[in-house]
Swiss-Prot record:
It comes from Mus musculus (Mouse). This is Sperm microtubule associated protein 2. The keyword Phosphoprotein applies. It is found in: Nucleus. The gene is Spmap2. Keywords: Developmental protein, Differentiation, Nucleus, Phosphoprotein, Repeat, Spermatogenesis. Disruption phenotype: According to PubMed:10747865, mice lacking Theg (mutant kisimo) have virtually no spermatozoa in the lumina of seminiferous and epididymal tubules. Spermatids in the vicinity of the lumina of seminiferous tubules showed vacuolation and were occasionally phagocytosed by Sertoli cells. Elongated spermatids have abnormal or completely nonexistent flagella. No difference is seen between wild type and null mutants in the number of spermatogonia or spermatocytes. According to PubMed:12748127 null mutants appear phenotypically normal and were fertile.
Length: 375
């Protein structure tokens, strides 16, 4: 409706000499002067505009389905449709009296007006008042309300129904949600199976499942009887442990050493914070002179030990007067070892390399490839 008003204002502010009113069209028909806006074009456009006006005011009420309202509709709803229809009729009638040569009406323009009027009618209707269901006692699910006898003042909620409900569902006519109808077969399958107490009664005359005669007359073998016998299990926790673990007489009469007694004593708890440090630290170096003397003392030999020879023996005169030869003196000299880079010449070339003659293949491989210059 806003676009139609703007278009009419632009036409009034900028008059076009070629625009003709309805009276001028009739006068032109009597005089026999036919223009571009003659009787066929003008009458067709006027009829189309009137037909569009009639459809605009009638079709939205027929096509739009009535929505079910949860509460009472506002009193202003019925008063809004009248002014809207009057405004639309005035706009279309005033536009029908004009004939524009530059811009002719089309089917898309009529459809746009129809959609806009339908949208205005949809926006004019008030929203559903959900607060009317606030104090209702019940649970709403998929178009049905389950009346709860215990809970009150429940908020309106939508959720999937439980398949374990066996109470009767009451149809809720206040909901505006379209849901599929549940068949009787689906309701029957959704209910849980009944607990038949007579099946498990001790005084029943017939068993739950009938046992065939061949099963009753069957004779079990010895192996089946052996496997069917339950195993005898001993409770190891009820046995006295003194009967299980027998201590030998030698262990009972054993005398522990001082080392064993010292290790058997529990360690005293740490008193300093440094002793609780889990990271081990190196011990300070302390030399024990007495311990060193003890280690330096040779071990005493047993009296029954007879050595091969006396630890003290005399040196022979021949050994004392011996003269070392030049070979022994040379072998007695330590080997002189050079440093890593001592006496090393990195530019030394062997004489064989100086005399060598290169073959044509070596010359070919030694020739560098041509390098193209970058432009």
């Amino acid at each position: 409706m806003g676009e139609l008003g703007e278009h009419r204002a632009s036409l009034l502010s900028n008059p076009i000499p070629e625009v003709k009113t309805l009276g001028e069209l009739k006068q032109g028909q009597n005089n026999g002067n036919l223009d571009l806006e003659s009787e066929p074009f003008g009458s067709h456009w006027l009829q189309g505009s009137k037909a569009t006006t009639g459809r605009t005011s009638e079709e939205p009420e027929e096509e739009i389905p009535p929505e079910e309202m949860a509460g009472e509709e506002l009193p202003e709803t019925s008063n809004l449709d009248g002014p809207l229809q009057q405004d639309l009729e005035v706009e279309v009638v005033e536009m029908s009296h004009l004939s524009i040569t530059e811009r002719t009406p089309s089917v898309s323009t009529a459809k746009g007006r129809k959609k806009r009027s339908r949208r205005l009618l949809e926006l004019a209707k008030p929203k559903t008042n959900w607060q009317c269901l606030r104090d209702r006692t019940g649970r709403c699910c998929k178009g049905y309300a389950w009346i709860s006898p215990r809970k009150t003042n429940l908020q309106f909620c939508l959720y999937w129904p439980s398949v374990y409900w066996t109470e009767r569902f009451i149809e809720d006519t206040t909901l505006t949600i379209t849901v599929p109808v549940v068949s009787q077969r689906m309701e029957e399958l959704s209910r849980p199976k009944r607990f038949y107490q007579e099946y498990y009664n001790n005084n029943r005359t017939t068993p739950i499942w009938s046992i065939p005669r061949s099963t009753l007359e069957y004779q079990a073998s010895n192996r089946l009887k052996q496997l069917a016998t339950p195993k005898v299990r001993n409770n190891i926790w009820s046995i006295n442990m003194s009967e299980v673990s027998q201590v030998s007489r030698a262990a009972q009469m054993a005398v522990p050493t001082p080392r064993t007694l010292r290790l058997a004593k529990p360690r005293p708890p740490a008193t300093l914070l440094e002793e609780w440090d889990p990271m081990p630290k190196p011990k300070p170096y302390v030399s024990d002179y007495n311990r060193l003397l003890q280690l330096a003392t040779p071990k005493a030999l047993s009296e029954k030990c007879v050595p091969d020879r006396s630890p003290q023996w005399e040196v022979l005169d021949v050994t004392k007067n011996a003269v070392a030869s030049s070979r022994i003196i040379s072998l007695a000299q330590p080997k002189i070892r050079k440093d890593l880079n001592e006496g090393y010449n990195p530019y030394y070339i062997s004489p064989a390399s100086l005399v060598a003659q290169a073959s044509p293949r070596i010359y070919e491989l030694a020739t560098p490839k041509y390098i193209t210059k970058k432009v």
